[in-house]
From Swiss-Prot:
Residues 316-466 form the Helicase C-terminal domain. InterPro entries: DEAD/DEAH_box_helicase_dom, Helicase_ATP-bd, Helicase_C-like, P-loop_NTPase, RNA-helicase_DEAD-box_CS, RNA_helicase_DEAD_Q_motif. The lineage of its organism: Eukaryota, Viridiplantae, Streptophyta, Embryophyta, Tracheophyta. It catalyses: ATP + H2O = ADP + phosphate + H(+). GO terms for molecular function: ATP binding; ATP hydrolysis activity; RNA binding; RNA helicase activity. Residues 1-44 are annotated as: Disordered. This is DEAD-box ATP-dependent RNA helicase 26. SMART domains: DEXDc, HELICc. Residues 11-20 have a biased composition (Basic residues). Residues 105-282 form the Helicase ATP-binding domain.
Length: 536
């Protein structure tokens, strides 16, 4: 998120072996602002500023303790912002801007609409919050919502709100609230009524709920002066375009609009033309060839049959724990229910496990996320709620079990480690029939690792652990696994093969017969009447 001050802890080295480093991309690049009128050729304007050399997943909160290329030479006190904001920045220990902030802040402070291509966790949150707060501080106090920030996930929304509270420390007339799914709508309604805020951070679905169901909310949102779409590409990937268009229709046309996105595909361009004024600025803070991964991350993959995956995972984790006293591991799984199963198995094996996924309540997710952020000696088993836009410092190892949805998902998961100039490890564990995915990351220096020899004690331990896991968890994992791989075109093309692979997964959990699936769910998957699938 935001650049923080240095500390001794930031320079402490890991007590573990260092693997080979991945390939980095050399050569400077100048961030560019492109003035566009929404049609025809674009005229480029070079923005003064240094080349972007930030790590893809680095949080600005972590950047502060790093010397060298991660920070610009520009200090916040060189920026035309109010003494109250500067005081809050100083209190938080922030001195120099990240290079993303250096490239974008001056233009945003001028009131321009901006589409910024910026990697997640590079200080972009401050780049849109600080100028918006400067504008809001000049407005008469009112119950209207003046700054609306839309985020793709609850976790990211909470982080943006936390960053806003830091910057608002001395702006006592301004307040911030979060509205997200997973909390009770009436509770949020009461909170907004009793303590009207000027800054609202929201996920699209819950914001739409309030527009449709909260009395007076549509009037309050007519006071919006600044609209921010954070991680715009992910908002669109998650299917929120229609919701965003409805929300835009509710708020005033005379406003400043800021879109921050790690990638700028055509769909992001389209929404920018809808949301922003003609002549908006496009600022690219990602140097060519540097959209990918960290030079500090040693990337490896293993290929093994599904029935060995639990044993290999346990073996790798035990070795990593033995090698690094300050281990902090994230294990990414394909779905929420598979995440739950893996967490239960590893917990039965007496590892220090926390789990986080979309089936957990928001309060439980927040509690686990906060604990993992502050702790060491923990293993977080996660679905993709932790893949992007969530800041966990000092992650020593990221393991991805099973097929990532795509190259981008692989990269963003990997981006949880190798931060602050420290080394990181990434391991991708695939079944033989998943190896086609490696073609999409062959330019990322992912090397093959030897599958470890699994001794009988590990095999016995895993088998016993699986035996202690409730059958219901295995049934839910099987159904979710089948749904996930059925959505993959390369695998679902041959339904009989998909059924055989699902049976392999079922056997890997210790089930003699694949679980039966409700007929309605099979119909929704398009798998009704497929031979080999049991239904109820």
């Amino acid at each position: 998120m935001m650049s923080g001050g240095p500390s001794d802890a930031t320079h402490r080295k890991r007590r573990r072996r260092r693997g080979p480093k991945g390939s980095g991309v050399d050569g400077p690049s100048i961030p560019r602002a492109v003035t566009t009128n929404g049609a025809g050729p674009e005229e480029e304007e070079v923005v003064e500023g240094k080349a972007m050399e930030l790590d893809a997943g680095m949080s600005a909160a972590e950047v502060g303790g790093v010397v060298g290329s991660h920070l610009s030479e520009t200090r916040f006190d060189q920026c035309p912002v109010s003494p109250l904001s500067l005081k809050a920045i100083k209190d938080a220990g922030y001195e120099k801007m990240t290079q993303v902030q250096e490239a974008t802040l001056p233009i945003i402070l001028q009131g321009e609409d901006v589409l910024a291509k910026a990697k997640t966790g590079t200080g972009k949150t401050v780049a849109f919050l600080l100028p918006a707060i400067e504008l809001l501080s000049t407005l008469p106090r009112s119950p209207s919502i003046n700054l609306l920030v839309i985020c793709p996930t609850r976790e990211l929304a909470n982080q943006v709100a936390a960053e806003a509270r830091k910057l608002l420390k001395y702006h006592r007339s301004l307040g911030v609230q979060v509205v997200i799914g997973g909390t009770k709508l009436p509770q949020e309604q009461r909170s907004m009524q009793s303590n009207p805020c000027q800054i609202l951070v929201a996920t699209p679905g819950r914001l739409k709920d309030h527009l449709e169901n909260t009395p007076g909310f549509s009037n309050r949102i007519k006071g919006v002066k600044v609209l921010v779409l954070d991680e715009a590409d992910r908002l669109l990937d998650m299917g929120f375009r229609r919701d965003i268009e409805k929300i835009i229709a509710f708020i005033p046309k005379e406003r400043q609009t800021l879109l921050f996105s790690a990638t700028v595909p055509e769909e992001v361009r389209q929404i920018s033309h809808i949301a922003m004024k003609r002549g908006y600025k496009f600022i690219n803070t990602v140097k060519e060839g540097d959209e990918e991964t960290h030079s500090q991350v040693s990337q490896m993959y293993m290929v093994a049959p599904l029935d060995l995956h639990f044993s290999i995972l346990y073996n790798v984790l035990k070795k990593h724990i033995a090698e690094d006293a300050d281990y902090k591991v994230i294990v990414f799984c394909t779905t929420a229910m598979v995440t739950k199963l893996v967490a239960e198995v590893l917990s039965q094996l007496k590892l220090n496990i926390r789990e986080i996924h979309s089936r957990k309540s928001q309060s439980a997710r927040t509690k686990v996320s906060d604990e993992f952020r502050k702790s060491k000696g923990l293993i977080l088993v996660s679905s993709d709620v932790s893949a992007r836009g969530v800041d966990y410092p000092d992650v020593t190892l990221v393991i991805q079990v099973g097929l990532p949805a795509d190259r981008e998902q692989y990269i963003h998961r990997l981006g949880r480690t190798g931060r602050k100039g420290k080394d990181g490890l990434g391991l991708l564990l695939l079944a033989p029939w998943e190896t086609y995915f490696l073609n999409s990351v062959q330019d990322l220096s992912v090397s093959q690792a030897v599958v470890p020899t699994i001794d009988s004690s590990i095999q016995t331990g895993v088998k016993d652990a699986l035996g202690r896991v409730e059958t219901k968890s295995k049934e839910s994992a099987y159904q979710a696994w089948l749904g996930y791989y059925n959505s993959n075109k390369a695998i679902s093309r041959d339904k009989s093969r998909l059924v055989r692979l699902a049976e392999e997964f079922s056997q890997s959990m210790g089930l003699a017969i694949p679980p039966a699936i409700p007929k309605l769910i099979l119909r929704k998957m398009g798998l009704n009447n497929v031979p080999g699938l049991r239904s109820v």
